[in-house]
């Protein structure tokens, strides 16, 4: 981290707060090195008090934000919502709630994020319990949630950045054939509605965490591999729109990857 913190073109580290010990360790590192680190919170890990709480220390979004503020003297922690969207809280899937109810819950969760000082919101519409999602439906849901969150931020005179997903974690890199069309439509909508265009795109790599290891081709990637070629095309597409690429679930990948 020391070596890279002053580099302009480098990979940023995002950490999921899987436990209070993990959160405290991140706070210790950011304080010692005086570097920014992003904490990315799934709705299962940390959830708004309006809907209950998360499994991490039973924290609500509101409580977690206050805890970080009380410990982060140099304001190095960047709070980010990870996988915000319909049915992204496991209780919603378990109870098989309707689309209207999960859509309302998603909005409540995002409002608490905004009120709690989150800087990045991940808009993830990739789950639907009752229908197979077309790319156009996912685009539509991304656009609507970006507009909703943007409007809520404007009411509060705040700003957030958006991350977007079109495929679930672990989806094949072959899905990127739709990517340029999708990003173009989302950017057009944002520009037409005075919404800041997304800053991050969670790219499909086929990579996912299984138990205590990574599955997928990312763990054996090299310059001659097919996945390297596919990911290079994906990254070039993102560069065309000046949107940063983000890879999820890299916990156990080797340094070479």
Feature-to-residue mapping (PLM):
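Short amphipathic alpha-helical segments, especially helix-boundary/capping motifs
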Residues: 1-4, 41-42, 124-125, 157-162, ...
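Alpha/beta catalytic barrel-like cores
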Residues: 1-81, 88, 95-104, 109-110, ...
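Active-site capping/gating regions of soluble enzymes
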Residues: 14, 107, 111-114, 119, ...
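Active-site-proximal loop/turn and secondary-structure-junction residues that shape catalytic pockets
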Residues: 19-21, 43-45, 83-87, 125-129, ...
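Short secondary-structure junction motifs
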Residues: 34-36, 74, 157-161, 198
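Short hydrophobic alpha-helical runs that function as membrane-insertion/retention elements
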Residues: 38-39, 121-123, 245-246
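Aromatic-lined carbohydrate-binding surfaces of glycoside hydrolases
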Residues: 83-91, 121-132, 155-162, 171-176
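Membrane-interface helix-loop-helix junctions at boundaries between adjacent transmembrane segments
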Residues: 98-104, 127-139
């Amino acid at each position: 981290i020391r070596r890279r913190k002053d580099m302009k073109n480098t990979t940023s580290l995002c950490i999921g707060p899987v436990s209070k010990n993990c959160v405290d360790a991140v706070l210790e590192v950011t304080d010692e090195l005086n570097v920014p680190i992003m904490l990315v919170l799934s709705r299962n890990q940390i959830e708004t008090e309006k809907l209950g709480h998360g499994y991490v220390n039973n924290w609500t979004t509101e409580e977690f934000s206050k805890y970080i503020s009380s410990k982060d003297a140099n304001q190095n922690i960047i709070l980010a919502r990870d996988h915000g969207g319909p049915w992204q809280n496991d209780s919603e899937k378990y109870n098989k709630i309707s689309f209207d109810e999960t859509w309302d819950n998603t909005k409540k969760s995002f409002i608490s994020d905004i009120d709690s000082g989150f800087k990045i919101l991940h808009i993830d519409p990739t789950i639907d319990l009752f229908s197979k999602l077309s790319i156009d439906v996912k685009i539509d849901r991304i656009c609507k949630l970006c507009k909703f969150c943007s409007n809520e931020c404007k009411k509060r005179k705040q700003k957030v950045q958006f991350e977007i997903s079109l495929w679930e974690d672990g989806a094949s890199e072959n899905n990127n054939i739709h990517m340029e069309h999708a990003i173009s439509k989302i950017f057009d909508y944002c520009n037409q509605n005075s919404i800041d265009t997304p800053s991050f795109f969670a790219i499909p790599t086929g990579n996912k965490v299984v138990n205590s290891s990574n599955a997928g081709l990312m763990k054996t990637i090299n310059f001659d591999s097919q996945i390297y070629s596919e990911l290079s095309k994906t990254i070039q597409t993102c560069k065309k729109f000046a949107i940063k690429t983000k890879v999820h679930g890299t916990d156990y990948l080797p340094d070479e990857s």
